[in-house]
A protein has these predicted regions:
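Generic non-transmembrane alpha-helical segments
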Residues: 14, 18, 164, 168-179, ...
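Metabolite-binding pocket within alpha/beta catalytic cores that recognizes anionic/polar moieties
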Residues: 1-157
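His/Asp/Glu-rich mid-to-C-terminal helical/loop segments that flank catalytic regions of hydrolases
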Residues: 239-274
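Zn-dependent metallopeptidase/amidohydrolase metal-coordination segment
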Residues: 212-250
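Non-catalytic positions within long, well-ordered alpha-helices that form the structural scaffold/packing
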Residues: 101-105, 203, 222
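Short acidic/polar active-site loop segments enriched in Thr and Asp
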Residues: 107, 208, 227
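Metal-dependent peptidase/peptidase-like ectodomains
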Residues: 146-185
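Active-site/ligand-binding-proximal alpha/beta "capping" segment
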Residues: 171-208, 273
């Protein structure tokens, strides 16, 4: 994407001109996980199609709107719908909103996703706090000329998911009595679901779950110095572990069932972020 900085500036200026809030936190709501915004107050909504240079989400379960609202006293941006590499977007387009968030002054990003479980201890409906990632998407959003105004040429990935935010999430879950697991998320290009042979290989590499998002966004946010917290909703067991065929409708069904718990958890975490 040419003139990325200038395009992101144009998007950011449009958002600032059409909203009154200036959040320092942004949350991305994955497939079937959009219930968090029901708890927003003073909500302002912008359709992606109205924001200059913004891609438009095409996947069922992704609304395609940017919200600015309040959770308690905390101002938050919420993306209802994300962009996936398998939809035909470039990696720069997939991660475009995060460049805009950086220019809007966002410092912390909360990512959610619906994904498949590889770890056999994770049943469908399990919430997994992501501790690290493995990139098997075949590319990287930071390939190409680097703009130092966003970040360094060779960004560090020692702590892709903020230890500070993970500890806050764990403490909050314990106080609320919410069960969760911790694990490694593998990013897979899609749109085909994985084969049983691929899942066996991924398990051997140390992956606990696999999905088609989150990894590019994580890399870009770390590159720009933003702290990331990410939680997966395990909606199905991966190929070769479960015997039934995969269905996106089933993914949405399980995500919706677990969504209330996830939203209660993350809503509390976000309100405790400083």
């Amino acid at each position: 994407m040419e003139y990325l900085y200038e395009k992101a500036q144009e998007s950011a200026e449009y958002i600032k001109a059409h909203t009154t809030k200036r959040p320092k936190i942004a949350v991305v709501l994955g497939s079937g996980l959009g219930n968090l915004t029901a708890d927003f107050t003073e909500t302002e909504e912008l359709s992606y199609k109205d924001i200059p240079n913004f891609p438009v989400s095409t996947v069922a379960g992704h609304k395609g709107a940017l919200l600015a609202g309040k959770l308690g006293n905390t101002e938050v941006y919420a993306m209802e719908g994300r962009f996936h590499f398998y939809e035909g977007y470039s990696m720069k387009e997939v991660c475009y909103p995060f460049y805009v968030f950086k220019l809007l002054g966002v410092e912390k990003v909360v990512l959610t996703n619906a994904c498949g479980g590889i770890n056999r201890e994770f049943a469908p409906g399990t919430l997994m706090l992501i501790t690290d990632f493995i990139n098997m998407m075949g590319t990287n959003p930071l390939i190409g000329p680097n703009d130092e105004r966003f970040g360094p040429r060779f960004p560090d990935m020692t702590e892709p998911y903020s230890l500070e935010l993970r500890n806050l999430a764990k403490q909050t879950a314990d106080e609320l009595g919410i069960a969760y697991k911790e694990g490694v998320y593998m990013g897979f290009m899609g749109p085909c679901y994985e084969t049983a042979a691929e899942i066996r290989a991924f398990a051997g590499m140390g992956a606990d779950a696999v999905g088609m998002s989150t990894v590019p966004e994580t890399m870009v946010c770390n590159y720009m110095g933003m702290k990331v917290l990410a939680v997966s909703c395990i909606t199905n067991m991966a190929t070769g572990i479960q015997t039934v065929k995969h269905s996106h409708a089933r993914v949405l069904e399980i995500a919706n069932q677990a969504g209330d718990t996830l939203c209660r958890w993350l809503g509390a975490v976000i309100q405790r972020m400083e």
